[in-house]
Amino acid sequence: MLAPRVIIFTTASLLGSPTRTEYEASEALAEIERRKIPLVLLTRGTRAQLEILRRKIGHAHPFVTEGGGGLFLPDGYFALRLEGAKRAARYLCVPFGRTSEEAGAAVQDIAEQAGAEVVRYADMNAREISSNAGTSEREAEASREREFSERFFFAGNADLAAPSFEKIATERNWRIRHCEPFWELYSGNDEGKAVRYVTRLYREALRSRLRSVGIGASFEDLSLLTASDQAFILPLRAGDFDERLLAKLPNSVRIDVPGAVGWNQTVLDVLSRT
């Protein structure tokens, strides 16, 4: 088998749910497996959340969690010395973001300085998170297992509390994003940095200049797509692209079909030209 000539980076959510009998992404996944193409999954969720999908599709390649908080490499995947890597169960983890413990403490400190009342994920159980987020308790529990960020909500009026909280957070080199109905505090998380890092590892390990392909759909995928050699953008819904993303990446390839069907089409097209 020849060494692969392409690496595929993708937002994991685009693969959809593989629980149905007819799984729309199955053909592309089978071709990826047959050709031994590296498929790197990225998520703004946690490792525990992504593991659910990885088990279902038999994913055995590196992955990136919490919006670039950490890169996880299966044990023995690269025969390279990785400076700064830490053991995390059966993976080596290269952290880019600050830890969830640091983020949790910062949430509390910033809230006190801002005069805001907050409730952190760490203060809630799975049932409470499930009730607020409208997810299953299993999904809520997986979401609680954060490693590079902390989620919370404002107990009072968020419109009044959030601006002051964000100002103080920024001054302390933290960033905040709204993940309805929660907010999230993080620092250092960078999907683009993770993509460039793992691309370099592949090129060093295989002694080949592989082409990197990025597949995304929303503005939050910008750093992933920018860090890839070629960007493919799927619509959020049929005929509805994220115009902010298109404006930033005028040379990207637009795919007309959303979701797992569009993802499947994109990957098969990429592989047919490789």
Mark where each language-model region is.
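Mg2+-dependent phosphoryl-transfer enzymes with acidic/Ser/Thr/Gly-rich catalytic loops
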Residues: 2-3, 22, 182-274
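Residue-level detector of anion-binding/catalytic polar loops
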Residues: 38, 175, 230-231
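Non-catalytic pre-domain segments flanking phosphatase-related domains
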Residues: 1-9, 56
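Active-site phosphate-binding/coordination module
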Residues: 21-121, 236
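Conserved acidic, metal-coordinating active-site core of Asp-based
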Residues: 110-213, 219-221
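Residue-level signal for inorganic ion chemistry
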Residues: 43, 67, 129, 195, ...
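Short, surface-exposed amphipathic charged segments that create phosphate/polyanion-binding patches used
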Residues: 77-82, 133-136, 268-273
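Structured N-terminal alpha/beta-domain signature
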Residues: 6-20, 29-31, 40, 44, ...
